[in-house]
Amino acid sequence: MDKRILEGFAAEFIIRLLLFGIFLISETMHPFERVIQPEEMWLYRNPYVVSDRIPTNSMFLISFLTPLSVVALARLFWKADGTDSREAGLAASLSLALNGIFTNTVKLIVGRPRPDFLFRCFPDGQESPGLHCTGDPELVIEGRKSFPSGHSSFAFAGLGFTALYLAGKLRCFSPCGRGHSWRLCASLIPLLCAIAIALSRTCDYKHHWQDVVVGAFIGLFFAFLCYRQYYPSLVERDCHQPYRNKGRMSGAQERKLSTPGYSLDV
């Protein structure tokens, strides 16, 4: 690997470590304690579900490992080179890191109670005057981090990126790839999984529907933003190649054109 490329990759890796560090710090911070009005109490009286359909650890594994697995499969079946794998890994990791920071920042500022907040606050169901919680302090703090849904945003940041990467590799929207329904269906599978993960949070009474919808938009936004930082538009003919590959090819062509005695075939 070229020394300049290696140094650039090291810098990108350090940036992601810093971003993930900021995300982990934000996980430990306390959210704004929003006042709950009597007329909105019904929104937060849903039962507290101990066993989630998709636990947080499983969500992180799916969101992080799915893009990496698809990138590895692309190298195996589509003969993608090391540059493509590196660029895809950088794009996916940036999407997830930025998504985590922005999602947690909004959570901490808004401080919206979860649908099961009152049962976190009062496990015995007996509400005290002034809403002085008697439940586990950690559960109560987490109960004020409803908006937006982290499960939803991370699922769409990771699986949304995977869908874009697949669409590019299969050239679903480029002139040479349109008209093949199996390509489109294959690229939509990750999005279907992301939707299932997001909706499971409403079934577990961990999020309101607005939390899930906004979380999905945040995740998709960063998935698209980071994908386009490294890959061209899906409607371009060479959408399956990262910008760095295109730049390397252009540089090689320029060197050939500048070689004495070289003639361009028309």
Swiss-Prot record:
Domain of life: Eukaryota
Keyword match Aminoacyl-tRNA synthetase: no
Cysteine disulfide links: none
Region Phosphatase sequence motif II, residue ranges: 148-151
EC class of the enzyme, as a word: hydrolase
GO CC, alphabetical: membrane; plasma membrane
Site (Stabilizes the active site histidine for nucleophilic attack): 211
Residues the record marks as active site: 151 (proton donors), 207 (nucleophile)
Gene Ontology BP term (one): phospholipid metabolic process
Coiled coil feature spans: none
Membrane topology of the entry: Multi-pass membrane protein
Region Disordered: start-end pairs: 246-266
Catalytic activity as recorded in UniProt: a 1,2-diacyl-sn-glycerol 3-diphosphate + H2O = a 1,2-diacyl-sn-glycero-3-phosphate + phosphate + H(+); a 1,2-diacyl-sn-glycero-3-phosphate + H2O = a 1,2-diacyl-sn-glycerol + phosphate; 1,2-dioctanoyl-sn-glycero-3-diphosphate + H2O = 1,2-dioctanoyl-sn-glycero-3-phosphate + phosphate + H(+); 1,2-dioctanoyl-sn-glycero-3-phosphate + H2O = 1,2-dioctanoyl-sn-glycerol + phosphate
UniProt subcellular location: Cell membrane
Extracellular side: 26-53, 111-146, 200-206
Chief site of localization: membrane
Inhibition and activation profile: Magnesium-independent phospholipid phosphatase. Inhibited by N-ethylmaleimide.
Documented EC number(s): 3.1.3.4, 3.6.1.75
Region described as Phosphatase sequence motif III: spans on this chain: 200-210
Entry's transmembrane regions: 5-25, 54-74, 90-110, 147-167, 179-199, 207-227
Keywords attached to this entry: Cell membrane, Hydrolase, Lipid metabolism, Membrane, Transmembrane, Transmembrane helix
Similarity-based family: Belongs to the PA-phosphatase related phosphoesterase family.
Purpose of the protein: Magnesium-independent phospholipid phosphatase with broad substrate specificity. Preferentially catalyzes the conversion of diacylglycerol pyrophosphate into phosphatidate but can also act on phosphatidate and lysophosphatidate. Phospholipid phosphatases are involved in both the synthesis of lipids and the generation or degradation of lipid-signaling molecules.
Family annotation (PANTHER family): LIPID PHOSPHATE PHOSPHATASE (PTHR10165), PHOSPHOLIPID PHOSPHATASE 5 (PTHR10165:SF87)
Protein name as it appears in the record: Phospholipid phosphatase 5
Organism of provenance: Xenopus laevis (African clawed frog)
